[in-house]
């Protein structure tokens, strides 16, 4: 098990912020996206924003003009907080997010990315520009997967925790015959030639898929699998490009083909890929399940239980599903002091805001709502306690099971605790 690196935590939080930003739509071209590369002079950015402010005063629509000017003012105020551009650069997203016409709610998101920004961009549009940040989420390392039988083959890729089928091929290689004499020998020669041609076709398709990944430095290895000797014949023959043959790191016996075959190939290659994310994730979820099934007291799930275990310093590894979307909501009446703290989904939050229009104690409409991600809060508590943190994807069967059966939040414990 590993401690989740700060970069892993940043990537998880970055994905959540990108998802939030992509949902926002402006009423006009009034949402500002600003990307400042690492090492760029902030004074030049401020000068550009002042020029944009001057230009924005000529916008015909009064509402759009007001919102763009407000967003630019907010951006310039925020940039004054920095003496210089952060080490990895800075991305600002500013604009009116109110869904009510005539109501202004200028919000700002400041994101220091987990790796250096190399793009400089200013855009005022109906949506925020998130593509440069999304590229940072893309897993760069990839493993090629090939399953080979006499009459069918599947080519795929393992990238991060996702197994993707890229190509499926079938052949007309005839089955073995029981006939004897010259007919049998002629039949066998035809069969061998058909097999050879099919292998060539597999190699050509694999070369077309994997060579670009090799050239970009993304391809870390190739694993070949199949139910019989055909896979060895394919590997030993001159079917793959010689540079790709050097990347073969394992040959594995499997029973299935197609997508199931690729999944079996990855599972059977666990020793080869033992440090890879998908194998580590499978092992972690299985360890969690083992403790739950055997009732060892060394695993727990659910927000209340996990939060208590974290606060007691009992968590060895915090497990959070990518699909976990719970938020903590704090609402307070500024008139009488009534307040409420609840955990709910994003969807439930929207309904909750519409339902709580007035204070249930004094009837005042002077309410303040505060909302934050439960996952981000628990990650911070875990890091302070020295606990491991693992984000569990939805791309594996184990990840899907963890999300559906346990709500996507659980923990493996260092020691047993009462009441959890």
UniProtKB/Swiss-Prot annotation:
The keyword Calcium does not apply. Keywords: Cytoplasm, Protein biosynthesis. GO terms for cellular component: cytoplasm. The keyword Lyase does not apply. Coiled coil: none annotated. Heterodimer of two subunits, one of which binds GTP. Belongs to the eukaryotic release factor 1 family. PANTHER family: PEPTIDE CHAIN RELEASE FACTOR SUBUNIT 1. This is Peptide chain release factor subunit 1. It comes from Pyrococcus furiosus (strain ATCC 43587 / DSM 3638 / JCM 8422 / Vc1). The lineage of its organism: Archaea, Methanobacteriati, Methanobacteriota, Thermococci, Thermococcales.
């Amino acid at each position: 098990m590993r401690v989740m690196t700060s970069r892993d935590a940043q990537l998880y939080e970055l994905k959540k912020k990108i998802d939030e930003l992509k949902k926002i739509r402006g009423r006009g071209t009034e949402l500002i996206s600003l990307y400042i590369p690492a090492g760029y002079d902030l004074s030049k950015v401020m000068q550009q924003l002042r020029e944009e402010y001057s230009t924005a005063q000529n916008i015909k629509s009064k509402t759009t003009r007001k919102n763009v000017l407000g967003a630019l003012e907010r951006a310039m105020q925020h940039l004054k907080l920095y003496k210089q551009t952060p080490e990895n650069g800075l991305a600002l997203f500013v604009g009116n997010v109110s869904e009510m016409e005539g109501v202004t709610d200028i919000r700002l998101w400041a994101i220091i990315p987990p790796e250096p920004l190399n793009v400089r961009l200013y855009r005022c549009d109906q949506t925020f520009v998130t593509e440069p940040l999304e590229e940072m989420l893309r897993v760069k390392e990839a493993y090629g997967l090939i399953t080979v039988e006499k009459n069918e083959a599947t080519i795929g890729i393992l990238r991060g925790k996702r197994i993707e089928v890229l190509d499926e091929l079938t052949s007309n290689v005839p089955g073995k015959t029981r006939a004897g004499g010259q007919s049998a020998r002629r039949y066998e020669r035809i069969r061998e030639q058909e097999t050879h041609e099919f292998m060539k076709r597999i190699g050509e398709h694999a070369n077309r898929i994997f060579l670009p990944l090799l050239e970009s430095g993304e391809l870390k290895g190739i694993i070949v699998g199949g139910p019989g000797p055909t896979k060895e014949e394919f590997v030993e023959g001159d079917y793959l490009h010689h540079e790709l043959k050097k990347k073969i790191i394992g040959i594995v016996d499997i029973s299935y083909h197609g997508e199931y075959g690729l999944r079996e190939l990855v599972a059977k290659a666990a020793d080869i890929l033992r440090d890879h994310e998908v194998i580590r994730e499978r092992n972690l979820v299985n360890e969690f399940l083992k403790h739950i099934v055997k009732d060892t007291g060394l695993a727990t799930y659910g927000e209340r239980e996990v939060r208590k275990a974290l606060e007691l310093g009992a968590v060895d590894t915090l497990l959070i599903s990518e699909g976990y979307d719970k938020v903590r909501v704090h609402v307070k009446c500024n008139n009488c002091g009534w307040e409420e703290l609840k955990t709910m989904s994003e969807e439930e939050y929207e309904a909750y805001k519409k339902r709580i229009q007035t204070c249930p104690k004094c009837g005042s409409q002077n309410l303040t709502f505060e909302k934050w991600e439960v996952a981000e809060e628990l990650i911070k508590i875990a890091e302070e306690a020295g606990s491991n943190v693992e984000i569990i994807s939805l791309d594996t069967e184990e990840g899907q099971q963890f999300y559906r059966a346990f709500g996507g939040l659980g923990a493996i414990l260092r020691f047993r605790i009462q009441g959890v």
